[in-house]
Swiss-Prot record:
This is Phytanoyl-CoA dioxygenase 1. Keywords: Dioxygenase, Iron, Metal-binding, Oxidoreductase, Vitamin C. Belongs to the PhyH family. 2-oxoglutarate binds at residues 98, 137, 152-154, 169, 239, 248. It comes from the Eukaryota. Its EC number is 1.14.11.18. It catalyses: phytanoyl-CoA + 2-oxoglutarate + O2 = 2-hydroxyphytanoyl-CoA + succinate + CO2. The keyword Iron applies. Pathway: Lipid metabolism; fatty acid metabolism. Fe cation binds at residues 152, 154, 237. GO terms for molecular function: L-ascorbic acid binding; metal ion binding; phytanoyl-CoA dioxygenase activity.
């Protein structure tokens, strides 16, 4: 049997037309459990010194902690995790927004998935020549306080010339409209990149204002644990707050082609060491 990432012609046509693709049962229940258990261990060992993550307020990207997370395993709290007194309102494990951005390199459990045959086969199907994971994130979408992710395109933040970013979003729990699943505008990737986030010596800024979108154009991408959503770098996608009592854990990888595509020196994420490719043609 071919790896789960080997795409059929029909799947490739759907991805080309819509800018996303859902692959059912991409990871086994055992693989999902291994990643969730490993993250629980990492959180348990976390001393509580992190930063607040928000997709609305980009002041945090001035923060040296955020920039250094490119090659570290760093913990980011939910915006609503703290009370007026500055203390956590709930347990530590229910307060973290995400962990990033180098799990795929520094942790053996997440590296096993990221460099596995399924992921490599997927990018071979997409005709990548020398794909490399540029960042990885474990996203918790905590019950009751899981923050929204505003409409965006991944190429805004992870730009190559020519653009080559593809996102992989692996559900580690069922994702529904109730607990904050992804939403996307089908075909929106065909309209090109709307704006970029630019990093200079001390700050970041966007080169254009945020576009406005009609919420009626978005469709929900409800998936089961173990399913994978493949996301074109120019696809408009988002997720709403999780106001439910149920979390929505997911692993997100962003992959670029390092052959024939140049990583922008204006991206927020700058590495001291080039990323390891999944394979080389």
């Amino acid at each position: 049997m071919p790896p789960a990432g080997s795409l059929t012609d029909e799947q490739l046509r759907f991805f080309d037309a819509n800018g996303y693709l859902v692959l059912g049962s991409f990871s086994s229940a055992e693989e999902v459990r291994a990643m969730r258990d490993r993250m629980a261990e990492l959180v348990d060992g976390f001393d509580g010194a992190g930063d607040v993550f928000s997709t609305k307020d980009h002041r945090q990207v001035k923060n040296d902690f955020f920039f250094k997370s490119a090659e570290n395993i760093s913990f980011f709290f939910e915006e609503k995790a703290f009370g007026d007194d500055g203390c956590l309102k709930q347990a530590k494990e229910l307060s973290i927004n995400k962990v990033g951005h180098a799990l795929h390199e520094l942790d053996p459990v997440f590296k096993k998935f990221s460099f596995g045959a399924n992921v490599s086969s997927l990018f071979s199907s997409l005709r990548y020549k020398r794909p490399a994971v540029i960042q990885s994130m474990y996203i918790f979408k905590q019950p009751g306080i899981g923050g929204e992710v505003v409409p965006h395109q991944d190429n805004t933040f992870l730009y190559t010339d020519p653009p080559s970013c593809t996102g992989l979003w692996l559900a580690l729990e069922d994702a529904t409209k109730t607990n904050g699943c992804l939403w996307a505008i089908p075909g929106s990737h065909k309209n090109g990149l709307k704006r970029r986030m630019i990093r200079d010596e001390i700050d970041t800024h966007f080169d254009h204002p945020s576009p406005t979108y009609d919420l009626k154009e978005f469709v929900p991408l409800e998936v089961k644990s173990g399913d994978l959503v493949v996301i074109h770098g120019d696809l408009i996608h988002q997720s709403f707050e999780n106001l439910s009592p149920v979390s929505r854990h997911a692993l997100s990888l962003h992959v670029i082609d390092t052959e024939g595509c140049e990583w922008s020196k204006q991206n927020w994420l700058q590495r001291k060491i080039p990323p390891q490719p999944l394979y080389e043609n």
